[in-house]
From Swiss-Prot:
GN (gene name): lysC
InterPro entries cross-referenced by the UniProt entry: AceGlu_kinase-like_sf, ACT-like_dom_sf, ACT_Aspartokinase, ACT_dom, AKii-LysC-BS, Asp/Glu/Uridylate_kinase, Asp_kin_monofn, Asp_kinase
Protein name stated in the entry: Aspartokinase
GO cellular component: cytosol
Gene Ontology annotations of biological process type: diaminopimelate biosynthetic process; homoserine biosynthetic process; lysine biosynthetic process via diaminopimelate; threonine biosynthetic process
Length: 406
């Protein structure tokens, strides 16, 4: 008997009809004599509607306002969890919903992008012993002040991964509207090849670099706890999947796993003579702000950072306060940027790869503003209007579909 965590995304539960159609998927796992715990997202579009409503009544720039914002946003997952429990009960399957405070899932105090500190598994284990399927409302936790705190966009993926880790699950399945992870965005490369198997570190880099199929926090958790994860389609579960797992790599051989892009970025330039590079980076990273790329443009004077566009408002408030306190002299924001990332083990050791890439892009009049290289990733900073052309160029140039890995 295995323990399987099943997470159903927003498109999988958009309507009552779709909620009913995931029941055979749950039944199929039960028929294998496996135990199942389910995590659900809000119905597709609901969270966006709730965000819009909150923005209409509040500036959302104070902690007390963000606390209420979290209460509003978490309601979408609560509705889905109860509806799925009702649907399963109609099929004579014992099921019950759980909200974050009932387990509890404990978080820190960073409203709207909280980090989970612990997951109590006692109630979940009791349910499994009684053959009751727990259905957990994703995306939410509760802090030490007994306030709901949401985990940020993609938070239901994070919830599923955390439950899998806490319960020592055998596998975590993420059901979405695509059949797995692709070597490039199918909207740009319609014939992009599906990756049948990918290791944890590559998946994490793809997620960090803009791949929408899995949130980076979830990828990081399953890598840390070595939990196999599958990405598969709710609407075609028989069409195969992508397995995210641990496997040996030949580090000296360049194997390109995929290309991903991210337009939802903010390029920040900061000038300061009183704060050094590390001090500025530490300030930017506070409150769980993710830094994609950082660079010291001019020693002890000018620094640049690439962060998530969603952090723009909070960072503007933060940097304005620093400027008013004379800790920095100036800052600028640029939102017309994007990154294109090439992921693959050992690519740093291929000395000709970067030369070939930059030569090809220059020939096609694509201006690469910045390059950052790690062991398994090359990041290119470009204008956001050149993303599609860049991805097309690189997919053709690197012949990803012919590597045998994807």
């Amino acid at each position: 008997m295995a323990l399987i965590i099943q997470k159903f995304g927003g498109t999988s539960v958009t309507t009552i009809d779709r909620i009913k159609k995931i029941i055979p998927i749950i039944k199929a796992e039960i028929a294998k004599n496996n135990q199942v715990i389910i995590v659900v997202s809000a119905m597709a579009g609901v969270t966006n509607q709730l965000v819009t409503l909150c923005n209409e009544v509040s500036s959302l720039n104070k902690s007390s306002q963000l606390a209420e914002y979290d209460v509003a946003l978490s309601s979408g997952e609560i509705v889905t969890a109860s509806l799925l429990a009702l649907a399963l009960q109609e099929e004579n399957i014992n099921a019950r919903s759980f909200l974050a405070w009932q387990l509890p899932i404990l978080t820190d105090d960073n409203h709207s992008k909280a980090l989970v500190e612990s997951v109590d598994t006692n109630l979940l284990n009791e349910c499994l012993q009684q053959n009751i399927i727990p259905i957990i409302a994703g995306f939410q936790g509760i802090n030490k002040h007994n306030r709901l705190a949401t985990l940020g966009r993609g938070g239901s993926d994070t919830t599923a991964a955390l439950i899998a880790a806490a319960m020592k699950a055998d596998r975590c399945d993420i059901y979405t509207d695509v059949e797995g992870v692709f070597a490039a965005d199918p909207r740009i490369i319609p014939k992009a090849k599906k990756i049948d198997e990918i290791d944890f570190s590559e998946m994490l880099e793809l997620a960090l670099s803009g791949a929408k199929v899995l949130h980076s926090r979830a990828a990081e958790i399953v890598m840390r706890y070595q939990i196999d994860m599958r990405i598969l389609s709710t609407f075609a579960p028989e069409a195969g999947c992508t397995l995210i797992t641990s496997k040996d790599k030949i580090m000296e051989k360049r194997i390109i796993s995929g290309i991903t892009s991210n337009k939802n970025l903010l390029y920040i330039t900061i000038e300061s003579s009183s704060l050094n590079f590390i001090q500025v980076a530490s300030i930017i990273a506070q409150n769980n702000n993710h830094i994609e790329v950082m660079q010291e443009i001019e020693p002890n004077k000018r620094y640049s950072f690439i962060t998530n566009l969603t952090d723009k408002n909070s960072l503007h408030i933060l940097l304005t306060n620093l400027k008013n306190n004379n800790q920095i002299s100036n800052f600028t924001f640029d939102t017309e940027i994007a990154t294109v990332s090439i992921i693959g083990h050992g690519i740093k050791n291929d000395l000709k790869l970067l030369e070939v890439i930059l030569s090809k892009l220059a020939k096609d009049n694509i201006n690469v503003q910045m390059v950052q290289i790690s062991e398994i990733k090359i990041i290119l900073l470009i204008n956001d209007k050149q993303v599609e052309k860049t991805v097309l160029d690189l997919y053709d140039l690197l012949k990803i579909s012919e590597t045998g890995h994807c």
